[in-house]
Swiss-Prot record:
Cu(+) 4 binds at C388, C391. The gene is Atp7a. Cu(+) 3 binds at C288, C291. Mg(2+) binds at D1293, D1297. The chain crosses the membrane at residues 646-667, 707-726, 734-754, 774-794, 928-951, 982-1003, 1349-1366, 1378-1397. GO terms for biological process: ATP metabolic process; blood vessel development; blood vessel remodeling; cartilage development; catecholamine metabolic process; cellular response to amino acid stimulus; cellular response to antibiotic; cellular response to cadmium ion. The nucleotide-binding domain consists of a twisted six-stranded antiparallel beta-sheet flanked by two pairs of alpha-helices, forming a hydrophobic pocket that interacts with the adenine ring of ATP. The ATP binding site comprises residues located in alpha-1 and alpha-2 helices and beta-2 and beta-3 strands, which are involved in van der Waal's interactions, and Glu-1073 which forms a hydrogen bond with the adenine ring. The heavy-metal-associated domain (HMA) coordinates a Cu(+) ion via the cysteine residues within the CXXC motif. The transfer of Cu(+) ion from ATOX1 to ATP7A involves the formation of a three-coordinate Cu(+)-bridged heterodimer where the metal is shared between the two metal binding sites of ATOX1 and ATP7A. The Cu(+) ion appears to switch between two coordination modes, forming two links with one protein and one with the other. Cisplatin, a chemotherapeutic drug, can bind the CXXC motif and hinder the release of Cu(+) ion. This is Copper-transporting ATPase 1.
Length: 1492
């Protein structure tokens, strides 16, 4: 491959992200942009790193694309960095199945492909790729007819430069790491961080307490690296901002361009070098054959490597190389560089061998599936001279770095060191000498012998086999485990479908599907089947499936408190013991915090096992207690805080208000005296100063000002403490909020008053200054009251979520059973200690702690708080139970299937939490407005101050006329300043961005909470807002409009009743169909069992199935069945009847009290055998049976109604006709009618045939139908409707509808019970009720209406309140004091929250409420009113409106055609339809018994 630079990388700062949902949204949306190859978004660093094609995108366009999503995107550095790309040369190896244009288009659409050049004449293609995004092997897999061109590849490699272009876009990061005490600490950090994907290199310095890291920002962020270091137990701090760098010469050498191996593999490598050596590497991180191919491709092309064999099963690679040109360490790094961060490579063994030896020649031709196993030995060395744990750590740190040492554990107590090592790389003697070199006395045990390592010399026949001296063992099948992300599941039937079909496949041992998590865990034999094949099998079932590469590790995380540790030796003892346990991936113990962080595989080991292991070491371990309560949702702490602040402020505010009222009364009294006696200004001053409160204690300090100051101080700095904290935090983060405004207003008023009071005292003024000490107490009283009421209201908005969280159980009773399922012991454990597979006992009245399956017992379970299902649900062995539901009567034993965060309840809680914290698009407008609001208000306040000062000095009469409480004892200048200052502070007090900020989130929280209580899960603000804009509702048919399972509609007996009875026919048919796996057969069997009131049927032999036609078999042993069953009396036993129609649904027959049966039947030993045929017309004709015209016409009528008609023959005589159909849900017609009455267009879209679709549409009242639409075409249909300018809601059961649900403006998934498809839709209806579709749109409209009302309140309040406060309306007498402004401000926030709480009064309309409407408004339609569109084409096929003569002609033609052929054209069916409504209510009713 030839390196070049056709891609750039840019890092964009993104503001406005609040949660991981924002990160996913940006990655999904920008990832779809044309020209974007890869994007990595970091919430912590508020940045997005994008790899893109510079020919299609620029940094500016990417910034604008993120801006358009509602986030603030900033380009601090607009200069992009180049990203390494490679050139792949492809050639045609077989006749092309696809045209060149299609191949080029396919390749260009692939992420990571930057360019494609096609040469049809030379039958080749040149593809430019980004190797970190897509590999050459993946390109070849996309186009099977093309393969890598080795000739061109080698030619290009030979002419290339000595050094390839370095990987651009790498970043250098330096971090300060505290708490490191020895080299073991540095090794731990380097080992942990060095394995992370995206980390290229790391060096930790113990002396400098510093880590230097080189990483790729598009794969990992600095914050993630910091978290990983802290997870090990060391505090880490970023010293300086990361900066981009270029690689050095050594790294350039490692990345040197090399040709790709030939298609023959590594076997056709260049001849061996004179000094060839063979080495075995252990490789962790390989998941599939693609990994094997990538490593072999990369290594086999290096000049100094003669051959390589990689084994996926043994996780190893054997490399033959020239030891004079390259070292094993370079080879190890070369393997890790194939996919940085994915592979973890260690050296297992190295054997030098001359090239002429048999082993070398055999190694070149080594088969892929044969590899030597790495060999390890253990030695115990006696060590004397150790005095403390520092000695222990020193020995462990030095020896652990020696080549070949796998692990070391030094015991200070026993004076020993236990070392596990690779005997091919080292031996006990060098290890003993190394310890002695450190100053200790080291002695090997007396009986110590050098381990004998037998290495089998590989031969041509058996290369690198183990020693032949060992007995040959029978290989047991290997079990591997993989995880597959499954999308499109909506209910338990989807789960059962996947599990049932996968278990049938060879090589698959077990399957466990988690519906809520959308994940399947599969155990398989890697020699038989691979994960990608399993994913393809799931896709064939109609679901989306992707192999989760890294899901197998770290899927269990445990936080423990460990008590009893005293030193670092204790820490090491716990860590080394646990990491040796199978199933534990990682363990980190922090001595300072007494905490252990453990990652484990729940399938192999559980939390109780880990705690027990630590206990056996002499320590006490317990779970870190987590707050499972919903206290953070009910705002109790905030309510208590603001209540305290309000009471403190109120305590000091009441005297201040008393003083203010007293002064207002006295000022009014003086003004009256002045008006009556016309006193001079000097007399007014004397009169004013003679008042008690105006008397001066000190010159310039009056009693009034002193009392006001003393009362203001505690309020300002105690009652207002929380405001100062919040304001400081806001300003520190360079933002301004409501708290900043409040602190500004109160601090300015307090500081101004204090300054002028001090100045007056300094000048010994005779006239007391006018102060504003009364402003802060009054402001804080009303603001604290507002916050108190606001948090009380907010607590109410989260009641639904708090109720869900409170359902979670805290403890579980785990029982132990013996082989006979008898109870041996019980144990109460914390619910977080429950492991998958545990047997749990749930007593009556108890909560189910986890999801599980009942293994013993019967009971009724209340699931109403989770599913909304009012009636208790019966549970028996095999039934699934949900965490949080309540057991009513009867004890149950359940086996845990999903625990911890995987339970259904946890997933629903997580979904509702994410929904309530997500933002609606309308909220983005409010957020931007609030961002500019505070600076704008501060500016308006300053302008108000200046304007009134200017007006006052220009025209004092205006201030004199409108200044409340003005008297001439105050100087003009002081009056002007006081009036302007008062207006300015009032503007600060009355302005409130809080009401804007609360308008949307409070309504969204209440709306989603109310929805959850009513079984409607809405995923956040965006779908909640979007649903009210919907103009078209598209329904899927199967499982949505209909029940999704076929049922028997009618049974017609076609023989005289004295020949064979109806019940006998049902017994024979039920027995015959019981062996069928076809859904129609299952429906027939179920119906027969219900009619005969039995669970057992006869015996079926010689069963044969002919797909597309029917079945044949022989039935016996039905006489006993008929004798035991409580059979019904035959009605109207008319001998001349040739056909009896019996309704399968509404028939009501009284049970017979007696039955006449021939004695020989009941007592017969050899029962009669019946030859049975069941199937369609073609099956009957094949078997030589003649179908009469009457029967054929009856079948035509059923088929016209969208039913499947099957015929039954017993002993070569046509005996019955059975009509089967998927029935319409009872509420479907009502739901469609209501949606239409709401002004919405309703469309039916189905993959079924047009006849069935037309029939269903006519029953529910839908006039527009898209029939015979493939699942892949449903997306196109939705998109087509959207292109017409319509907002589309897609309603489906999610099995084949998930792409269309994702494409729709609002995707609504209908589930049964709690089985919810959280990835397939925006709105999930827990109950299988179509009226919830109406309720979800109705709730959306109510919520959006409430949001708009809230915005009107907030905007009108600010638009009117601010001008009033600024004094604009003084001419009409509107004047506000600062305390009035603060009261109004508090009232605005409370009013918005209370307005949102009105949504809690919402009641979902019920079926009974809807049924109160007049029955004349039913929505059934005649065929002529229905427009059917077939397939992907948009050609409308309207039913023709024919005249009477045309109808008679067409009916006759249809009858003649029915005798000639079994296939009906669309037109013949459509024209032969009578009016549907007349059929449903007229003579041809389903509950009639018709005799032909």
């Amino acid at each position: 491959m030839e390196p070049n630079m056709d891609a750039n990388s840019i890092t964009i700062t993104v503001e406005g992200m609040t949660c991981i949902s924002c990160v996913r949204t940006i990655e999904q949306q920008i990832g779809k942009v044309n020209g974007v190859h890869h994007i990595k978004v970091s919430l912590e660093e508020k940045s997005a790193t994008v790899i893109y094609n510079p020919k299609l995108q620029t940094p500016k366009t990417l910034q604008e694309a993120i801006d358009d999503m509602g986030f603030d995107a900033l380009l601090h550095n607009a200069n992009p960095l180049p990203v390494l790309t490679n050139t792949v040369f492809l050639t045609v190896t077989a006749p092309l199945a696809l045209p060149w244009d299609h191949i080029q288009s396919t390749l260009l659409k692939t992420k990571g492909v930057t360019g494609v050049k096609i040469s049809p004449q030379q039958r080749s293609a040149v593809v430019t790729i980004i190797p970190s995004v897509v590999s050459a092997n993946q390109i070849v897999e996309l186009v099977p007819d093309l393969s890598l061109d080795m000739g061109t590849q080698e030619k290009k490699s030979g002419t290339s430069e000595e050094h390839s272009t370095p990987q651009a876009g790498e970043v250098l990061l330096k971090m300060r790491v505290e708490g490191m005490t020895c080299h073991s600490c540095t090794s731990t950090i380097e080992g942990k961080v060095g394995k992370l994907q995206g980390v290229q290199r790391i060096k930790v310095s113990l002396d400098n307490q510093e880590a230097t890291i080189v990483y790729q920002p598009h794969l990992i962020t600095a914050e993630e690296i910091k978290k990983q270091i802290e997870a090990v137990g060391f505090p880490a701090f970023i010293k300086k901002q990361p900066k981009y760098l270029k690689l050095g010469a050594i790294d350039v050498e490692r990345l040197k361009s090399t040709p790709v191996k030939s298609s023959e593999g590594s076997q056709q490598k260049s001849p061996a070098y004179p000094s060839d050596s063979a080495i075995t590497f252990t490789i962790d991180g390989m998941h599939c054959k693609s990994c094997v191919s990538n490593i072999e491709s990369a290594l086999s092309t290096l000049q100094y490597v003669s051959s390589i064999v990689v084994s996926l099963e043994n996780r190893s690679a054997i490399v033959k190389y020239n030891a004079s040109l390259v070292t094993p360490e370079i080879l190890r790094k070369a393997i890790e560089a194939v996919s940085p961060g994915q592979y973890r490579v260690s050296i297992s063994s190295e054997v030098e061998s001359p090239t002429s030896s048999p082993s070398s020649s055999s190694l070149q031709k080594m088969p892929l599936n044969l590899v030597s196993q790495p060999l390890t030995q253990e030695v115990v060395i006696n060590i004397n001279g150790m005095t403390c744990n520092s000695c222990v750590q020193s020995i462990e740190g030095v020896i652990s770095k020696k080549p070949g040492v796998k692990s070391i554990h030094v015991s200070l107590t026993n004076s020993t060191g236990t070392i596990e090592y690779d005997p091919l790389l080292t031996s006990p003697e060098p290890l003993r000498e190394a310890i002695e070199d450190m100053g200790f006395d080291a002695v090997l045990p007396a009986d110590m012998k050098e381990p004998l390592v037998v290495i089998a010399q590989p031969s041509l026949e058996t290369p690198l086999l183990p020693s032949t001296t060992e007995p040959e063992n029978v290989m047991t099948p290997v079990q591997n485990k993989c995880y597959i992300q499954v999308s499109g599941m909506t209910c338990a039937s989807c789960v059962a479908n996947i599990e049932r079909n996968l278990r049938r496949e060879e090589g698959i041992y077990s399957v466990l599907v988690a519906l809520m998590a959308g994940k399947a865990e599969v155990r398989y034999n890697p020699a038989v089947i691979q994960p990608r094949v399993i994913a393809e099998l799931i896709r064939e079932l109609g679901f989306g499936a992707v192999v989760m590469e890294n899901a197998g590790e770290g899927n269990g995380i445990l936080e423990l408190v460990v008590r009893g540790m005293t030193c670092a030796s204790c820490v090491h003892k716990i860590e080394s013991t646990l990491t040796k346990h199978k199933g534990i991936f990682y363990c980190s113990v922090a001595l300072a915090t007494n905490k252990a962080h453990i990652k484990y595989d729940p399938e192999i080991i559980g939390p109780r096992d880990i705690i027990h292991t630590i206990g056996n070491l002499g320590f006490e371990a317990s779970l870190v207690k987590k707050d499972r309560s919903a206290n953070h949702l009910d705002h109790k702490r905030e309510i208590k805080q603001w209540r305290g602040s309000f009471l403190v402020s109120l305590f000091f505010c009441i005297p201040v208000m008393g003083l203010m009222i007293y002064m207002m009364v006295m000022d009014h009294h003086l003004a009256t005296l002045n008006h009556n006696q016309n006193m001079s200004n000097e007399e007014m001053i004397n009169m004013h100063s003679s008042m008690f409160l105006e008397r001066q204690i000190l010159p310039g300090l009056s009693i009034m000002n002193l009392l006001s100051l003393l009362l203001c101080l505690p309020v300002q700095f105690c009652g207002g403490w929380y405001f100062y904290i919040q304001a400081y935090k806001a300003l520190r983060h360079k933002t301004a909020n409501m708290d900043v405004l409040i602190v500004l207003a109160t601090t300015i008023a307090f500081a101004y008053s204090l300054v002028i009071l001090l100045v007056a005292m300094y000048e010994r003024a005779k006239v007391n200054p006018i102060t504003f000490f009364d402003t802060p107490p009054m402001l804080f009283v009303f603001i604290a009251l507002g916050r108190w009421l606001e948090h009380i209201a907010k607590g109410k908005t989260s009641e639904a979520l708090a109720k869900l969280i409170s359902l979670q159980a805290t403890e579980a009773t785990i029982v132990t059973l013996n082989s006979e399922n008898l109870l041996l012991s019980e144990e109460q454990v914390d619910v977080e200690l429950v492991q998958r597979g545990d047997i749990i006992k749930v007593v009556p009245g108890g909560k189910f702690p986890v999801d599980g399956r009942v293994i013993e017992g019967h009971s009724m379970v209340d699931e109403s708080l989770i599913t909304g299902e009012a009636m208790p649900v019966a549970k028996k062995p095999g039934s699934t139970v949900i965490a949080g539901s309540i057991n009513q009567n009867g004890s149950l034993l359940i086996r845990a299937t999903h625990v911890g965060a995987d339970t259904t309840l946890s997933q629903i809680v997580k979904l509702v939490e994410e929904a309530q914290t997500s933002k609606a698009p309308i909220q983005q407008f409010a957020d931007k407005l609030s961002g500019y609001f505070v600076p704008f208000i501060v500016l308006v306040s300053i302008v108000t101050l200046l304007v009134w000062i200017i007006i006052g000095f220009q025209n004092f009469e205006i201030v004199e006329a409108y200044f409340p409480g003005y008297n001439r004892s105050i100087s003009r200048t002081e009056t002007i300043i006081r009036f302007a200052f008062q207006a300015s502070i009032t503007v600060l007090c009355i302005a409130c961005p809080c009401s804007l900020g609360l308008a949307t989130p409070t309504a969204v929280m209440v709306g989603t909470g109310v929805g959850a209580q009513n079984g409607i899960l809405i995923k956040g603000g965006e779908p909640l807002e979007m649903a009210h804009k919907v103009k078209v509702v598209v329904f899927d048919k199967t499982g949505t409009i209909t029940h999704g399972t076929p049922v028997v509609n009618q049974v017609k007996v076609l023989v005289e009743s004295n020949k064979i009875s109806r019940n006998k026919i049902l017994a024979i048919v039920g027995t015959a169909e019981s062996n069928s796996e076809h859904p129609l057969g299952a429906a027939v069997t179920k119906y027969c069992k219900q009619e005969l009131d039995t669970e057992t049927l006869g015996t079926c032999t010689d069963f044969q199935v002919v797909p597309g036609c029917g079945i044949s078999c022989k039935v016996t042993n039905i006489e006993g069945l008929l004798h035991k069953s409580n059979l019904k009396i035959e009605e109207n036993n008319i001998k001349n009847a040739s056909l009896v129609q019996i309704d399968a649904i509404n028939e009501q027959s009284s049970p017979s009290s007696s039955m006449i049966i021939d004695a020989h039947l009941s007592n017969a030993v050899n029962t009669q055998q019946y030859k049975v045929l069941i199937g369609n017309r073609e099956w009957m004709i094949r078997n030589g049976l003649v179908i009469s015209n009457d029967v054929d016409e009856s079948m035509i009528e059923h088929e016209r109604r969208g039913r499947t008609a099957v015929l039954v023959t017993i002993d070569d005589e046509l005996c019955g006709l059975i009509a089967i159909a998927d029935t319409v849900k009872p509420e479907a017609e009502l739901a469609v009618h209501i949606l239409k009455s709401m002004g919405l267009e309703v469309v039916l879209m189905t993959g079924d045939n047009s006849k069935t679709a037309r029939s269903i549409a006519s029953q529910v009242g839908i006039t527009k139908v898209f029939a015979e639409v493939l699942p892949s075409h449903k997306v196109a249909k939705v998109k087509q409707l959207q292109e017409e300018g319509k907002r589309v809601a897609m309603v489906g059961d999610g099995i084949n509808d998930s792409p269309a649900l994702a494409m729709a403006s609002v995707g609504i998934a209908i589930g049964t019970g709690t089985d919810v498809a959280i990835e397939a839709a925006d709105v999930v209806l827990i109950r299988n009720d179509l009226l919830d579709v109406v309720a979800s749109i109705d709730l959306s409209r109510k919520t959006v209406k409430r949001i708009r009302i809230n915005f009107v309140f907030a905007l009108i309040y600010n638009l009117i309140g601010i001008p009033i406060a600024a004094g604009v309306f003084l001419p009409i007498g509107l004047v506000l004091q600062p305390w009035m402004g603060s009261a109004a401000m508090a009232a605005s926030s409370v009013s918005v929250v209370l307005s949102s709480l009105f949504l809690k009064l919402y009641r979902k309309p019920t079926y009974d409420n809807y049924e109160l409407r007049p029955r004349s408004h039913t929505g059934q339609r005649s065929p002529s009113e229905i427009s059917v569109h077939v397939g992907i084409d948009d050609t409308s096929r309207n039913s023709p409106r024919l005249g009477l003569l045309d109808r008679i002609v067409n009916y006759s033609r249809a009858s003649i055609n029915s005798l000639l052929s079994d296939k009906r054209s669309l037109n013949s069916v459509v024209t032969s339809e009578p009016d549907k409504h007349s059929l449903l209510v007229g003579d041809f009713r389903e509950d009639d018994d018709t005799t032909l």
